[in-house]
Amino acid sequence: MSEYLFTSESVSEGHPDKVADQVSDAILDAILAQDPKARVAAETLVNTGLCVLAGEITTTAQVDYIKVARETIKRIGYNSSELGFDANGCAVGVYYDQQSPDIAQGVNEGEGIDLNQGAGDQGLMFGYACDETPTLMPFAIYYSHRLMQRQSELRKDGRLPWLRPDAKAQLTVVYDSETGKVKRIDTVVLSTQHDPAISHEELSKAVIEQIIKPVLPPELLTDETKYLINPTGRFVIGGPQGDCGLTGRKIIVDTYGGAAPHGGGAFSGKDPSKVDRSAAYACRYVAKNIVAAGLATQCQIQVSYAIGVAEPTSISIDTFGTGKISEEKLIALVCEHFDLRPKGIVQMLDLLRPIYGKSAAYGHFGREEPEFTWERTDKAASLKAAAGL
């Protein structure tokens, strides 16, 4: 019986790129709480002792950006120079401009050539769902995120007090080539920042027994499963001191772990007029409802947009041979049941709210948080009925 391997990774909230994402989304939320129609493109850079805030923001909101940045960094756990980054002591620079009026006229209703709210940029976005996990996400990315959430939980509640904020996990999974189903877990890689006093042996044992085994399905862990824990032997220097962090540099971690294509546009720090974010959320919503309806066990959708134009320039669907109806019929159903114009997406998913901070670590998809409207399967029944199944 032939097999193949597939790997995905996740990173913790203390990873420098994720620190940047969380600061950007915290600033977005602070603005949307006061001004839901704000235009925000908030970029963040974090390095040793430094946090730089830049981008384009047009808003009536009055926000203390420096305070928001410091509070976010502190909540993550960087509150001492001993950890490599200190929320209270780092320098924070603010360099925001306003959105270009040339872009604004294409996005604001009634101002551009297309009188509807146009897309904020050209681009292509993907959505994906499959039946490998309860939340209809690919196995490797779903469980990589859960490992990182477990690391954070044990760090914050004090059960493993030598843990520090920066960490990464990577899962390699064995699939059956004939059925496409997960057979077993081949390799677990987990690297975590730690207090210098802990030995590698003690750390490895605790990570395997208290982080990995409580999270991963025990029936998929075998005698052949390999565990690579802090493989360099030491991970004391981490976070923004170990590496410079930038918003938007973990786009595969944020989405499907490489199991589906990515259009290239990052999410964090962007208000919902940016289709990079809102249309990617809508695509996940569409794909998840198609799988939840039983119309396919695997579904990938691509949409594309032109700046200033409301209607998508293309919609395509691939069910990888698992569809119960043709892909042409699925596209027709999608057009009938989902409004994929930018304003329609915002209304359909109720996106003009301060809901984004939670999405900036541990994945934007496959988490049944009440704010994550794109994870609902409320269209599944109507799709199934319309398909005649």
From Swiss-Prot:
Catalytic activity from the UniProt record: L-methionine + ATP + H2O = S-adenosyl-L-methionine + phosphate + diphosphate
Residue sites binding L-methionine per the record: 56, 99, 243, 274
Record-listed ATP binding positions: 15, 166-168, 234-235, 243, 249-250, 266, 270
Record lineage: Bacteria, Pseudomonadati, Pseudomonadota, Betaproteobacteria, Neisseriales
Organism from which the protein derives: Neisseria gonorrhoeae (strain NCCP11945)
GO molecular function, one term: methionine adenosyltransferase activity
Function: Catalyzes the formation of S-adenosylmethionine (AdoMet) from methionine and ATP. The overall synthetic reaction is composed of two sequential steps, AdoMet formation and the subsequent tripolyphosphate hydrolysis which occurs prior to release of AdoMet from the enzyme.
Swiss-Prot/TrEMBL keywords: ATP-binding, Cytoplasm, Magnesium, Metal-binding, Nucleotide-binding, One-carbon metabolism, Potassium, Transferase
One GO location term (cellular component): cytoplasm
Record note on cofactor: Binds 2 divalent ions per subunit.
Subunit structure: Homotetramer; dimer of dimers.
Pathway the protein takes part in: Amino-acid biosynthesis; S-adenosyl-L-methionine biosynthesis; S-adenosyl-L-methionine from L-methionine: step 1/1
Region entry Flexible loop, spans: 99-109
NCBIfam families: metK
Cofactor: Mg(2+); K(+)
Subcellular location: Cytoplasm
GO biological process per UniProt: one-carbon metabolic process; S-adenosylmethionine biosynthetic process
The name this protein goes by in its record: S-adenosylmethionine synthase
Binding site for Mg(2+): 17
Pfam families: S-AdoMet_synt_C (PF02773), S-AdoMet_synt_M (PF02772), S-AdoMet_synt_N (PF00438)
Keyword ATP-binding attributed: yes
Binding annotation for K(+): 43
